[in-house]
Amino acid sequence: MMDFGLSDDQEALQRAAREFLARECPPALVRETAKTADGVPRALYAKMAELGWMGLVVPETDGGLGLGTLELALVCEELGRAAAPGPFLGTQLVIAALLRAGSKAQRRRWLPALLAGERFGALAYLEESDRHDADGIALAARRTRDGWRLDGTKLFVVGLPGADVLVVAARSGRRGISLFLVETAASGVRVRPAETIDVTRRVGEVRLRDVALERDALLGKEGAAWPMLAHLLDLGAIGIAADSLGGAERALEMAVEYSKVRQQFGRPIGSFQALKHMAAEMVAEIEPSRSLVWYAAYVFDKTPAEAPRAASMAKARLGEVYSRTVNRAVQMHGGIGFTWEHDLHLWFKRARWNEVAFGDPPFHRDRLAELDGY
């Protein structure tokens, strides 16, 4: 049975993460990083790596902390609270792919640099069809004498252009889906940043034109990668849901703090009933959402068969809760809440991207209904 609370060690991890990010990742750093070419605050990620965050779920034998997805979700939650920039989640998905299907040689090549915060990764799966299932994958992989050739385009790759290695989903043959490790510096790979509303994290498009890969670029078995890709997409959905939870909590805190100092008619605006009710509605939505996120992260490790359903519940719920929470926070601030000068807009815009990343709420509700046989 799951204990509906965190262990002492988990609470300590979350508390330490919150304190670290409050100190090392203030809004000023988020703004500065938004102006850089790749959107990666490397000094911050070096410190995160020293804390072991890049290898939270990696076994100790491979240089990690040997923790679970719930601990990873707690760190994602705090990254969302800080609106932290950089390719953390994308790198975790590449690490998860290596742990699940990587050969010893692939692990030796990539894990040390990824865990040290020296290299970063991203999952490239979404295409022009905007589908999150196997039928949406058209990028072609064909065998050659020396290995493979890849042709196609991936859109909205979270973590580009800062990623060094991609896990690319490709169609090999008529029905098979295969995953490949592709370096962004390889010949024939073109990365183009994509503009989105969210300035706190980067997204890009990657075009592969007759990209030659060696045999050992294949992750796992040829044509049998859809279950693993679905596993990675569930992990991505849980990570984004956790990020949304932390962001919603921070937006609520900012709104309440502002309502205590902003005066109207000789009294703090937080004393007015309408704003009290608005804050109460925010709390009432956030608190039960926390259980969905933690449960999804818990069953991802403990009861994998339940993970798709739990991931969709968490992602569908948190996508909307985060957006509604920041909307209300902006209303409580008035017009200043959406100006560039006020930090709240960073969370407002991040919420919009989180809502659609790894499947929007309608997609996950449809998926949940299908999983439940409706």
Regions found by a protein language model. Name each.
Residues 117-128:
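A short, Trp-centered hydrophobic/proline-enriched beta-strand micro-motif
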Residues 1-86, 101-106, 113, 117-118, ...:
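Alpha-helical interface subdomain recognition
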Residues 133-151:
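Cytochrome P450 C-terminal beta-domain/meander region
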Residues 67-68, 133-135, 159-163:
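Short glycine/proline-enriched turns and hinge-like loops at secondary-structure junctions
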